[in-house]
Amino acid sequence: MTAKKLENNSNHAVTAEEVKILTDLLDESTRHLVGDEEFAKIKGLVKIAASSDHSQLESQIACLSNQEMIIVARYFATLPLLINITEDVDLATEVNLLNNTDKDYLGKLESTVDLVAEKDNAAEILSHVNVVPVLTAHPTQVQRKTILELTNKIHDQLRRHRDVKASTINRKEWTNQLRRYIEIIMQTDIIREKKLKVSNEIKNVMVYYPGSLIPAITKLTARYKELAREKGLNVDGATPITMGMWIGGDRDGNPYVTAETLRLSATIQSEVIFEYYVKALNDLYRTVSVSTSYVQPTPEVAELAKLSADNSPFRENEPYRRAFYYLESRLAHTEMELLDVFSKEAVVKKEAALKAPVYKDAYEFKKDLEAIKRSLIQNHDRAVTGGHFDALLEAIDVFGFHLATIDMRQDSSVNEACVAELLKSARICDNYSDLDEEEKIQILLSELNNDPRSLHSSNSPKSELLQRELKIYHTARLLKDTLGENVIKQHIISHTESISDMLEQAIMLKEYGLLDSEKARVQVVPLFETVEDLQNSREIMKRYLSFDIVKRWVASKGNYQEIMLGYSDSNKDGGYLASCWNLYKAQTELTAIGEEQGIKITFMHGRGGTVGRGGGPSYEAITSQPFGSIKDRIRTTEQGEIIQNKYGNKDAAYYNLEMLVSAAVDRMVSKQKVSQDHIQDFTASMDGIVEDSNRVYRELVFDNPHFHDYFFQATPIKEVSSLNIGSRPAARKKITELSGLRAIPWVFSWSQSRVMFPGWYGVGSAFKHFIDADPNNLKELQEMYQGWPFFHSLLSNVDMVLSKSNMEIAEKYADLCEDEATRSVFDIIKKEWELTKEVILQIEGHSKLLEDNPSLERSLDYRLPYFNVLNYVQLEMIKRGRQEKLSGIYESIIHITINGVASGLRNSG
């Protein structure tokens, strides 16, 4: 029997009860805040929204004053937020329940290990699996940290309600706690008044580690190894999950990311993991009170105890406690020394710590702990070494002293400018940027192969750009020398279009010894983003990997070469189908090149939260990758509101990480459901379908003279761009140019206007054309849907996006257009939407959208009426703002509605 998605097991009755409790408390808090008269207007809107009478909703909202708009916006923005919490609690409860039973669900670790155990090389497979979620700070997390903390408190209260019998909880006290948090939310600024700095983004994402990610990852890693041992497989060195980080190192298009932010990111991360280790040692110190009156420690532990500064007479017979004290002193001294290297402030040094020697690395720290564990086991205290003790050992393997690996990223054009300046300064080439590709390659290879010296010198004049870039590489070298090799492992090149783009990056790394002619301490990782670049990636990588120097770099990295794939720009460039298909083909071709050259090509997937940016259910996203494309390792970006949704509490974090690992392993070992001949037939069909889709998409986006104005007039792009939700600018160029607009605000704006354009446009016409060409083609598409994971996932995502779109509301945004010619673009969009819905249901064999996703259907039924209200408030305020100059209250209301719609959709950018 096929395992079901865990979300489909949800307890709808309890969730509905909790939604009612929270809604009643919100009503009560709002009435006290605004009075009976104003509250009656809000409840009137609730009633109209539930009836789906959009015309009445629009007319009622148009009658509200600006001051009334604030209250209405706050109320309806808070409702979907509270619904989200109840659903998150339901998922967390279900995860906890099923992990303590024998019941199966899609992605459960036990089933995954059972599947692998049948293979002859099972131990090798499980030992090398490594899935890396990379946390990023793209501007899609619209919730303030303050609001997130309050919603987490409500989450905890609801968990209490579920974890104990309802009859045993103090209902009055419990309800008062919930009431208190909701009242505070209603009186707290829901949006940021100041734009975030990079330092804020670093600190914001760190909150997910102590209470969520660290316990979830250590638990999952321990469970992974335990399940393998039960099958007779030794995978003790496995790290199925490690974490990545872009914040502080991703300077592509963000002038605020500097050497200082890179240093700050590494330092804060290090502080977080040291704090965890110290707390864990304190816990062990308190609990492991084993006395020499009963058992004797090994000589190793006796020596650790002897070195301890814990000379209390009460600890005389407790060697383990004294040993833990010594380890904590060594750890404290180690952290002090690291902070001394990076901190500009004086570090307060404790005398006890100074007497203990510094750990040279995390492995040395682990060796001391393992000595204590061996002693306890020798004395038959095996139970003592489980739980927190084993969790600490797992944490050291996963997090070291660095916590997460920081990626560096820069645009290829910046690298070229810097290399051109370096070559000119070193009197090697005065006109590097004017050379053709072949000439560039020869100069770069000569420098990399033959001259170990840096091109720059300390006293040579440098542009501001080059100075800033060199400081970053210098800091990266310092971080690796201090915190270990894993703190920074790769440098990604945005807009990689040529071999020289990668060799230029190598030159920059060489300047501070991060790469030489024999090895690469930091790997050069190309990022292929546009449809054209994806199509060219095969030939670029084939030649790049043929260079002897590159082969040596790859060999120094364990024979792995990572390639990053960009989902956002390829979608904006060619539409959803063209993006998905070219990404799929690129992976297939690049994997084959790696196999030809004896290299394991691994992929980093630059996904966003929305389908238009590569988002969608994680399990399906990974299991729909081409067969053979996952070689042990896979990395994927997690950003914005997706981080909160997936990792906001330890149960949800465990489940989502478990899904990632299970999906990766499943794709590595499962067999294709359809024959290779069928896949080849499907591939040929897809080539033609995608060509049609790309043509339809580009005809509207790039060839229609009115599309540009439509986008800027019929979506809240200007309002979205002014949101204080990230440190990075919304556009590379002027905000009035589509070409310079970043993919994130592009997608975000279409989400707000409920068109969801990037997730489906061009799909309907392409499939319709294919079906009309041959009566048998519909059957082929249905076979593709049933037997090809890639195609099934693609259609399911389109189905989901269509269900979240709303053409009635989208048409109201179209009415914002200043002339009929511009507004006519909506007629094209609506016609394509209707066609896409019709064809998708035909291929799926369904009678309605979300027919095979009942949990999402119920979720949208809860929330859609409420954030429909927010859309009409947003529309009215945009109209008022464009007709007359309004005070700051206008922007505040708009931003509250943007926040609420994003919360309701749950994957807005």
UniProtKB/Swiss-Prot annotation:
Its recorded reaction(s) are:
oxaloacetate + phosphate = phosphoenolpyruvate + hydrogencarbonate
Q: Which of the seven top EC classes does this enzyme belong to?
A: lyase
PROSITE patterns per record: PEPCASE_1, PEPCASE_2
Q: EC no.?
A: 4.1.1.31
Q: Name one GO cellular component term.
A: cytosol
State the InterPro entries in the record.
PEP_COase (IPR021135), PEP_COase_bac/pln-type (IPR022805), PEP_COase_Lys_AS (IPR018129), PEPCASE_His_AS (IPR033129), Pyrv/PenolPyrv_kinase-like_dom (IPR015813)
Which residues does the entry assign to the active site, renumbered to this chain? 138, 572
**Entry keyword annotation includes GTP-binding:** no
Q: Does the keyword Lyase apply?
A: yes
What would be an example GO MF term here?
magnesium ion binding
What processes does the entry annotate via GO biological process terms? carbon fixation; oxaloacetate metabolic process; tricarboxylic acid cycle
Pfam families hit by this protein: PEPcase
Which keywords fit this entry according to its UniProt record? Carbon dioxide fixation, Lyase, Magnesium
- The leader peptide range reads none
Write down the required cofactor(s).
Mg(2+)
Q: Which family is this sequence assigned to?
A: Belongs to the PEPCase type 1 family.
Name the job this protein performs: Forms oxaloacetate, a four-carbon dicarboxylic acid source for the tricarboxylic acid cycle.
- Tell me the protein's name: Phosphoenolpyruvate carboxylase
Record organism: Lactobacillus delbrueckii subsp. bulgaricus (strain ATCC 11842 / DSM 20081 / BCRC 10696 / JCM 1002 / NBRC 13953 / NCIMB 11778 / NCTC 12712 / WDCM 00102 / Lb 14)
